[in-house]
Design a protein with these regions (language model features):
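Short alpha-helical segments that sit at the start of domains
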Residues: 1-18
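Short, locally clustered residues in the helix-turn-helix/winged-helix DNA-binding domain
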Residues: 20-24
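Short capping segments at the starts of secondary-structure elements
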Residues: 25-29
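A short acidic, leucine-rich amphipathic alpha-helix
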Residues: 32-35
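Short amphipathic alpha-helical interaction segments
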Residues: 38-53
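A short, conserved structural fragment
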Residues: 52-62
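Basic, amphipathic "hinge/linker" alpha-helix immediately C-terminal to the N-terminal HTH DNA-binding motif
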Residues: 62-78
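Amphipathic alpha-helical dimerization/coiled-coil segments
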Residues: 76-101
Length: 101
């Protein structure tokens, strides 16, 4: 159960990293994104596909470019992560109160 959560966190981290580079360096291709991020090209390609399906980036002949939705999402993301972090912390505290931890 928790390994799935850890995998999802890593996936979100990768997608967010790729999106950040697209916003900062657009237009940018897979090879350059791979070099900058340290992720292999096949993982970058997958992240780009996910981001495109979320309408956060769009392809161009020169490489990926961010949509207007991407900048809004990047501003929204830290607050959402803090909210989720608090929920997990509260879950842990509830288990402590019940004597599970």
């Amino acid at each position: 159960m928790l390994s799935r959560l850890e995998q999802e966190i890593e996936l979100i981290k990768r997608h967010a990293t790729i999106l950040k580079f697209v916003v900062e360096k657009a237009p940018i291709g897979i090879i350059k994104l791979s070099e900058l991020s340290g992720y292999p090209q096949h993982k970058v390609r997958y992240s780009l596909r996910v981001l495109e399906h979320q309408n956060l980036i769009k392809p161009s002949s020169e490489g990926a470019v961010a949509t207007s939705k991407a900048r809004k999402f990047i501003k929204f993301l830290p607050g959402k992560i803090k909210q989720l972090s608090r929920r997990l912390e509260n879950l842990g505290l509830s288990f402590e109160k019940e004597g599970f931890l």
